[in-house]
Amino acid sequence: MNTEATHDQNEAQTTGVRLRNAREQLGLSQQAVAERLCLKVSTVRDIEEDKAPSDLASTFLRGYIRSYARLVHVPEEELLPGLEKQAPLRAAKVAPMQSFSLGKRRKKRDGWLMSFTWLVLFVVVGLTGAWWWQNHKAQQEEITTMADQSTAELNADKDSGQNVPLDTRDATSQDTTPAQTAPAPATPVDSTAATQTPAATATATQNTVVAPSQANVDTAATSAAPAATETPSALPTSQAGVAAPAADPNALVMNFTADCWLEVTDATGKKLFSGMQRKDGNLNLTGQAPYKLKIGAPAAVQIQYQGKPVDLSRFIRTNQVARLTLNAEPTPAQ
């Protein structure tokens, strides 16, 4: 009867009461139990008062109670029913991993943004390349067209230039015929001079064939042959005056370091030159300023105007057809 009464009494006592009674029987204080179990005094007090701290997990609380029971020699099996009531096991709540899905969604968005950026970059590069190619092709077509036009003009100039010596030769023969058929004077000195006149006439005729532009000068010299018979020293003087003309201050001098097409027009609209110049070639032009120039390859030509070099660097940098006008500078009065 006493055993059953003791068992019923133990069941009536809670876990905290039984642990406190066992501690008091052993003469231990709460401080001593806390030091041996490495717990806080407040935790030991909560266990004896059957309190479950809110900041303490049930798993840890059950472990502390078992350690306390072993310390005060209380069987753990007797405390199990009370443990289920005092510290029931609670299922742990698992929070959804929102950060992972958020990071994945953000990474996907960044991938789309990067793809769009690369697409825009490729489009810009493609448009730039197409624009450059169109400009380059247009320049090449323009140069080809100008070269074809200059070739046609050169052929026309050659055809007209071949007819000039024939007309000049006829005019020269007409002018020299009276000089050859003129009656010879009676004096021996005059006959000697008349004998030299046909030779000078023949020489003038040969010069007109070689240089058509001097036909008028040679014709005038031939028509003046009777006057030369009277004063033989006058002929060399007049020839020297024709051979050494005065230098034109508006002369245009060009030296070519590579093949280059160009067109030069003076103020009257006359084309002084239009065509292709080869490497190491030189070109001296004289006309009425200002000059208008079109140069296919500015880097291949060096220009001097009025003794000063012409700056073509702005055309060389852009690698375009040079179009410029050279204005005449006033010369100082002498």
Curated annotation (Swiss-Prot):
Spans traversing the lipid bilayer = 112-132
Q: Where is the composition biased (Low complexity)?
A: 176-207
Instruction: Cite the ranges annotated as topological domain Periplasmic.
Output: 133-334
Topological domains on the Cytoplasmic side lie at 1-111
Q: What are the subcellular locations of this protein?
A: Cell inner membrane
Record's keyword terms, sorted:
Cell inner membrane, Cell membrane, Cell shape, DNA-binding, Membrane, Signal-anchor, Transmembrane, Transmembrane helix
* Pfam families the record matches: HTH_25 (PF13413), RodZ_C (PF13464)
Membrane topology per record: Single-pass type II membrane protein
Which InterPro entries would you find in this protein's record?
Answer: Bact_Cytoskel_RodZ (IPR050400), Cro/C1-type_HTH (IPR001387), Lambda_DNA-bd_dom_sf (IPR010982), RodZ (IPR023690), RodZ-like_C (IPR025194)
Q: Which residues form the signal peptide?
A: none
Q: What are its GO cellular component terms?
A: plasma membrane
Q: Name one GO molecular function term.
A: DNA binding
Q: Which residues bind DNA?
A: 30-49
Q: What are the start and end residues of every segment in region (Disordered)?
A: 155-207, 221-241
According to its UniProt entry, the protein's GO biological process terms are: regulation of cell shape
Q: Give the Gene3D superfamilies listed for this entry.
A: lambda repressor-like DNA-binding domains
Where the record annotates domain HTH cro/C1-type, the positions are 19-71
NCBIfam families with a match to the protein in the record: PRK10856.1
By sequence similarity, the record places it as follows:
Belongs to the RodZ family.
Under the heading HAMAP family, the entry gives:
RodZ
Q: What is known of its domains?
A: The helix-turn-helix (HTH) motif in the cytoplasmic domain of the N-terminus is involved in the formation of spirals to maintain the rigid rod shape. As this protein is anchored in the cytoplasmic membrane, the HTH motif may contribute to protein-protein interactions to form the RodZ helix, which is localized beneath the cytoplasmic membrane. The C-terminal domain may be critical for determination of the rod shape by probably interacting with enzymes required for synthesis of the peptidoglycan layer, including PBPs in the periplasm.
Q: What does this protein do?
A: Cytoskeletal protein that is involved in cell-shape control through regulation of the length of the long axis.
Q: What is this protein called?
A: Cytoskeleton protein RodZ
Source organism (scientific name): Salmonella schwarzengrund (strain CVM19633)
